[in-house]
Amino acid sequence: MAKTFTFELVSPERLLLSEEVEQVVIPGTEGEMTVMAEHAPVMTGIKPGVITVVRAGSEREQFVVFGGFADITPDGCRLLAESATRVKELDRADLARRIEEVRAEVQGARDHETRTKAEEFLGQLTTLEGALLPA
């Protein structure tokens, strides 16, 4: 049996998950990362994407996150998300609304740096939309 560790997924609204899991795949800013028990300590940024939680017996659950940070230790992983929801609860209209808000930010950007960051975030959101909600 695979070793487990404590995984917590926290958003500003609530604690979405806190339990023992076998592994978690997170969308790190430097690329996808699989976290398992006894992982080397690291802190990483999280980009918009899907978190896959694998429980004992290979049961899986997925969450959508819209940025944040993960604190990974040998004993566990705490992911503080800017916003998060279960994939099965994701609303196409809500995601489309978020994309339109970011498009407006791109259009209203007053400087190059702000526009570049908004365009990058918009690209991540539209990629996420295509992966999760095919037309």
UniProtKB/Swiss-Prot annotation:
InterPro entries assigned to the protein according to its UniProt record, in alphabetical order: ATP_synth_F1_dsu/esu, ATP_synth_F1_dsu/esu_N, ATPsynth_dsu/esu_N
Annotated localization: Cell inner membrane
Coiled-coil ranges from the UniProt annotation: none
Keyword Endoplasmic reticulum annotated: no
Record's keyword terms, sorted: ATP synthesis, Cell inner membrane, Cell membrane, CF(1), Hydrogen ion transport, Ion transport, Membrane, Transport
GO molecular function, one term: ATP binding
Record text on subunit structure and interactions: F-type ATPases have 2 components, CF(1) - the catalytic core - and CF(0) - the membrane proton channel. CF(1) has five subunits: alpha(3), beta(3), gamma(1), delta(1), epsilon(1). CF(0) has three main subunits: a, b and c.
Function: Produces ATP from ADP in the presence of a proton gradient across the membrane.
Protein name: ATP synthase epsilon chain
UniProt source species: Chelativorans sp. (strain BNC1)
